[in-house]
Amino acid sequence: QEAGYNVIYKRPDNTEFAPDQNEMATLQGGYRFSEMTDQGTMSDYGLCDYYDNVYNLNQMDRGNYGYNEFQMKCFTSAEGFITSNGGGGVLCSYFEKPVLFYVPSGKELRPGYLTKQNSYIKKLSNSDINVVIDKGQTNDYSKLLNEMRKVFKWK
């Protein structure tokens, strides 16, 4: 836990939407999202239980709210967002809070696509957009962690 933040983790589980070509390849290939820890290999959802103050949105008590309404209430209360590029990142940008995009692939790699003043994302929102590019898809998250410290004022 850094700086007293709580983290709400949100990732669809391939059952909420019609799968795209990447999800189809993942499902057909039997691939799972996982990470090595001192406790062995665990899924990205399992990591939510592994770390303190990390909560899986899919497991939170929604009360009488539907999934989307609950998600919007959580997003409204957030201090900011860390997201991958794509539609989920666009949604995060609507709340006028700092957004940190991690971009390993896609059209967002183009210079200025997310950051220039007249970019698509800036036209949709008035959020402070920050971007970490991982063009070689090296999954070296040190740049992301450094940018998180700057954007969210961690020490």
Regions found by a protein language model. Name each.
Residues 5-109:
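Donor-binding and catalytic core of enzymes assembling or modifying cell-surface/extracellular glycoconjugates
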Residues 1-2:
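Histidine-anchored nucleotide/phosphate-binding helix
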Residues 89-155:
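Nucleotide-sugar donor-binding patch of glycosyltransferase catalytic domains
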